[in-house]
Each structure stands twice: as structure tokens, then as C-alpha cells.
Amino acid sequence: MEHSTRLAHISEDGTRTQTVYDHLAGTARLAGSFAAPFGAQSEAEFAAWLHDVGKYSDAFQLRLKGGPKVDHSTAGAQEAWVRQHLHTAFAVAGHHSGLPDGGSPADDPGDATLFGRSKKPVAPYDGWQEVTLPASTPPAWACADPLSLAFFTRMLYSCLVDADFIDTETFMDGKAAPRGSGTDIAALRDIVSAQAQRYLSAESPSPVSVQRNTVLRACLEKGAHGPQGLYTLTVPTGGGKTFASLAFALEHAAAQKMKRVIYVIPYMSIIDQTAAVFSGLLGVENVLADFSNAEYKTVEQDDLTPAQYRQMLASENWDAPVVVTTAVQFFESLYANRSSRCRKLHNIADSVIIFDEAQTLPGDYLAPCVSAIAQLIQHYHSTAVLCTATQPALEPLFRRFAPELHPQEITPDAARLYEVLRRTTLQDLGTLPQEEFAFRLANHPQVLCVVNRRKTAQQLYAALPAEGSYCLTTLLCAADRRRQLDDIRQRLKEGLPCRVVSTSLIEAGVDVDFPVAYREQCGLDSLLQTAGRCNREGRRGAEESIVYRFRLDECSTPQMLRQNVSALDYTARHQDTLDTPRAIQLYFNELSDLRGPDAVDKHGILDAFLRGIRGCQFPFAQVAEEFRLIENAARTVYLPVGEGAALCEQLRSGHVTRTLLRKLGIYSVSCYKDQFDKLDAAGALELRPDGSAILTDTSCYSEKTGLAMDVETGIGLYF
């Protein structure tokens, strides 16, 4: 059959064309393959065949020749709507502008909701009748309840927009877009298995290594033979859970024929360290580190310049065998509505997902986060592992969303492991004046101090001897943090003076070993994380390796930590020893009681889909705005320091690639709005269209203390 010559795209140089039919067919092939792991291949193909039928219109053909803008998405959405494919209608309507709110039957044709767009007049597109739509029925579970339908809609949307982007990219570039790069999962499993055997067969292992090997053996065994589902890995800090959890993940992915491993960590500040460890073992080509905060706002694809289109495509798609990302990126993407953030979602299906430091999952959003994890396990062929030294009390929430899911603990005897791996003694120092406390720190040749505020860290650092003192906060770019941590480890190894004042970024996955540590008032989980940086290798007795809990006269407890501090105080009154599974369980139960039942979904994310918002059904756009794990959204500032200078020039040139953004990630700092605005007002920033900026006044950045917290007339002031 001869197909219509109606065009979907014209190449940049004007010499090549792609017909609408060919674009629909290519997109359908890709979308179907993306949805196959969760049994929705026909639905994704159905959506893809409809998504651009509006391009058959005379109005759109005129647009390709420079005519006025035209809405080409609504036509396909209306075709899905009349066929009662609600999820497809959402996906097609939003495949450029983002998933819309559902709205209500009373909405007008001019409203941006799906109800409104279902009534919107569109230009005739009769030529689309050459398309034969495939038979399609969504999986029964996808329509079982509003939460499942909303999640399925986002996953379907992800398959559609990623397929659309890739087919368009392939045509524009004149060659197939590279996909699925990297080594086979089974081959990566073999690499990690070989390394594991070297650890297990080492001669004369230390007592700590013996226990780490116990954990590793359990991970290898469960990974290879355990069923797909929900697991916990409860291991004290310093128990080797990073490598052991990776070993579990690759064994399990190979056994269950899953596509990838996704490692979700709490802080962007340690992505570089975790990715470096994995890359050194598996090869850089197999590990994708999701560094960048940049999000490219979606607009009508046909209105983008070639440079803007390349920039949009540079956002990460998570198509590597091993992905390292943050909890913020992971969960915000799952509740996003923009194509730039959602196109990766289908690649979460068919994965092993490791949640490192699971106790840091955001309390105010805990219910929607657990609901999403439950959906992935139940319907999207994924396995989740909650990996932590301080296992939070999440079982009641999992019972609520997935009663048949029963967490399986990987560690054979967690209580025994905690007893054997106890390497520190916890003491409460009480309250001290800041000046007296700084003097106390200065008298330690080697010491770690973790505080709650960056300003406090700066002040204490300023009071320490210059030689061998360090200040670690998220105001430092990853490149400088890495350099400082290398210096710190070397000085500790050589027995040289090494005094470190840090914010909590050092508590998650940073491998350092101090003889003594201090932790400003906090929750039990944070206290034990700091303890994991003291006598980590067990070379000293626990009685001489003290971790002090303290308060400063001049510093009030941050509002967000007050319930955690109260829960720790309660636990300390009822337990003689705080570093045991029993004490940890008591702490999290008390914390849950203090927060109350509504705190786990403080912003009503789940209710928005269950009941709507002020009559608006399925409010995808509103929820995406509300679901912000970092309430005061951070902005990315790129730093022209070191290798970052040349990278910033490449960014200015407009030739943006994934590789460039990945490299720039370690020369960037995320800062909050007030700090960003002050730098901008001082003329220190070159603003970019995506909301990020390049620092133009390098005096506002110090390799020792990071980006200025305050500025006056363009001069950085460090506190």
C-alpha cells in the first residue's frame, strides 16, 4: 500500500523529509518495545500510532513551511478519548507540553485540561485514516484503582515520549541513535562475582573483614536464588554494604533477566564517589551517573532550534546497565508530568533498585514514595532493596499499598552483626559554648565533627589551625570535594593532623576512618552514620573510639530535625545501648508517633489521585508542582574553575551533549533561591535558558570553602 506524502519532519539542511506515517510507525516500534517488560506493548503502540495524527492536517503542513503554530497533539488525544482509552488520551495530549490535569466535565474547550481539550476544535486531519490502529486492551491491574491508573499513565507516557524523541533524533541526525550501550548484565555479574571471590578468599582477614564477608555471601546467595520482590539489607555502617548490595543486584538482575541496576543514593554530593567506585570495577561505559540538575523545559518540538533540540536530548535517559542517581531525581521523576523528566521512567521497569541509606527517604512524602516502590515491584518486574544501617519502620506502609509484599531480610542475623561490628562508644557531651567547643576540636590531632548548618561548619572551620583542617559542605563542587577527601584520607593514613568539619554529606557512603568524632544534636540514624566514620576498620578498641553527641549554645535545632532529636532523647531514656536493632526500631516507632499518621503524605499527593483536587480529576500537572522533595528548589551554578573553564565555554557554544553535562556535573553547585538571587544581583552569574547559570565572578568561589553564601557588590563573603 502506498502511503501519504504528508510530512512530519524536514531535516535541518532541508534536503531530507520524513512522512507522518513513517514517523508513527517508527515511534510505535520503539514504544512497544519499551512497554513490553510490563505487558503493555499493544497500548504503547496504540498511543504511538495516534500521537502525531494531527500532522496530517493542512495547517501543520503549512507550519513546516514557516506558517503559524498549530496544535497537532489534541487530534490524537481526541481519537483516544472517543475510544475510551483515558490513559492514552493523557499521554498523547501531553507528549510535548506535559501530562495535563484531567479537569472536570464542566471544563471549556479553551481549558488546558484533558476534559477541555476533548472539546477543542482541531484542524481537519483526514489523511490519518491510512493508519490501522492495533487492537489494544490495558492490563487489568492498570485500571484496578486510581493510583495504579495514574502510575500506568506515566509509564505509558514515558514509552511514548522517549520513542518519539528517539525516532525524531534518528531522522534529524540521519543515523540511528545509540541505544542500550554497555556490557551485558550477566557479564557485569561475572566481573563482580570474581571480585567477590577475591574478597572471600583473602588470607588472614581482619575481624571486620570476616563480618563483611558474611554479608557478601548472603547477598550473593539471595541475589542468585531469591525471587523478584522486596528486600531489606540491614548492615551496620562500615559493614561493606555498598559492594555487597551491588553484588546482590547484579546476581539478581542476571538470574531474573532484568535489564539494569539503579542505585538510589540520598545526596548528590556522593554521586561522584559511588559512581567512581562502580566505574572502576565495571568500566565507565557501563555506569551512568545522573549528576546534572538541569531540566530542559518541553515546548513544541517543531519550534526548537537544532541547538535547543540537542540540549533537550542531552537530559539523561538512564539507558546504561548501572545507573547512579539521587532519591530526589528518582521520586520527583516518578511524579513528574514533563516529558524531559518522564522519558526515563520506562527504564526503571525491569530493574533492581537499591535504595542506599533508606532511612533518609523524605518523611513528608513517605507514603507516595512507598506507593511508587510497591507499584514497581508488583507490576513492573522490579526488585527493590532497602539498604541501611538503621532500617526505618516502613512495613505498615508496604502492607497498606501491597499487602502481599513481605520484605525479606538478606542479612542472616542482624542483631549478632551489630554486636560483633560495634567499634565505638557513644557519649552525650551536653551543651557547650561554640568558642569552647572549637578549642576542644583544635586540640584533637585528628577529628571529625558533623554539624547541621553550613554556616556553623564555616565558623568552626575558621577557628581551627590552617594546616590539616577541612570544611566539607555542598557549597563545594564535586571535583573539590573529591580532592579534599583524597587529601583527608591520605593525611589520616599517614597520621598527619586532620580536622574535618562537615555537614551531613559525609554521613552517607563516605569511606573515612577517624579516631574520634562529634555529632551535633540529630536523630539516631544520623548519629550512627557519624559513628560509622569513627574506627571504621576496627583497629582500635570501642572504648577508646568515642563518638560525642553535643549541642552548641548559639545554635538552635533546625525545625526539620526537632522531632528526630526528641525521638533520640526518648530512645536514650529507654535503652542503655543505642547502636542495636532494638534501639533503632524503638527510635523509628517513636519518630512515627511524633509525626502522626498524616505526616507521611503531608502534601496530599495520593489523595489528589484518589479524590481529585477541587473537582479536578487526575491532576498530573498540579501534583508535579507539589511533589518537590527539596521544597526550595535548587538551581545549578556551573563553575569555570579547573577543567570546568573549558567545559563552560563548550556549554556557551550551544553544542550540548550528555557527555558534556556529565562532565560539568562535577564542576557545579546546587544553591537555593536566596543565594542564587544574591549572586545574580551582584552580577556574578550568566543566566541560561534552562534556569541554570555560569559563575562569571570566580572570586565568589573558594576551593576550600565553596560557593559564597552571601555577596556584596560582587565580592564573596565566607561565613
Predicted regions and their residues:
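Accessory nucleic-acid engagement/destabilization modules that flank
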Residues: 1-195
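Walker A/P-loop
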Residues: 226-249
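Conserved Walker A/P-loop ATP-binding site and its immediately adjacent core
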Residues: 258-282, 289-294, 393
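Inter-Walker segment of RecA-like/P-loop motor cores
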Residues: 283-335
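Interdomain hinge/linker at the junction between the two RecA-like core domains of SF2 helicases
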Residues: 389-442
